[in-house]
Amino acid sequence: MRNVYIYGDSLLKATVPDEELKYHFHLPEIMARYPSDRVQVTNRAKMGATVSKGLSLVEHDAQRGLDADYALICYGGNDSDYDWAAIAADPAADHQPHTKRETFRQTLESMLNVLYRQ
């Protein structure tokens, strides 16, 4: 059996909004399509997570003896978001995303290095 760990934000949590923008989890429905005797999935995705939160989760799992054959990583939606209230208050100011591009790249690379060492 292969062990797969999933790290990411709400996209990898299989979270989908309905017409009223209420979020629903669909991971059990998706996983039911795959034979459980071949793949064991541990989903560590968190709603609202950024790449920094992901690195913390990977480091925590590694310290506890992470046993993954594969890891799926997907961050960026929350990292690239902006403080929209600040933008509305001062549209002419220099506004940056929650995570700057270089910080995102370095943090993702650190996450991959932790996983490679496992």
Language model features by range: what are they?
Residues 56-118:
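Alpha-helical cap/lid subdomain in secreted, periplasmic
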Residues 21-22, 48, 52, 102-106:
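Conserved phosphate-coordination/catalytic loops
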